[in-house]
């Protein structure tokens, strides 16, 4: 895994939010930039994005996120471009990492599997994943249910490889806490939705800046998988947060609709949403996180010194 970085952070790959501008800005600021390949509506666009990212980040690490669910008919084409452009890290989501293993290992890359349970973590390692991204309670988008501290501890009982943890971490102190608990890296998503370089529309960024944790709802009623949605966005799309429907079948294709609305038009956020105060460049966000991270480490060191005095 990449060291040294300014911070042990991945700007999490976010659907319809993470594009080349955000990936490049994150990498240049000293963290790992990532994007989901389905954000590109064509294989030609994906080729263009990867070409640009690779040219602009140089030797800095970056990450492509593949959806390995059986509904992703474009996966073989995406994998062909992964082989061509060789992102150092490939995160697999919504399915087994197995389809990506041979391609990524052939050029020396690392496969990280998104997991939401200990059972899935064990399956991912058995399938050949090099590392795990543990998606915990508090994450935006498709979310988890486990405490990050409990999840880290449970995984570390059988796995000592690279471990990313994500879910509600919105400041540098949270990053330091996750590292102290045993994670190697942290996923941060919601904080970067409002970055100037993200693909999110202005209205989405404004909604984030106005939102608090109470404005979130976890529901499987949109895509069939539990996800954390912004209540104001649900209402804007004609849904009642207090009366959500039963979960449909899996609907990971953004063109699929719910009550006449594309589910991709419903906006999500994680429990760290209250930390978003407005739109900023990614570099400014990273620099603030770094100051907070350093301050948290200093507090821990000072507390230890006091306890030994």
Question: What is the predicted function of each stretch?
Answer:
Residues 17, 169-170:
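Residue-level detector of alpha-helix initiation sites
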Residues 148-164, 170-309:
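Conserved active-site-proximal phosphate/metal-binding subdomains
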Residues 1-162:
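Active-site entrance/lid segments in N-terminal catalytic domains of soluble metabolic enzymes
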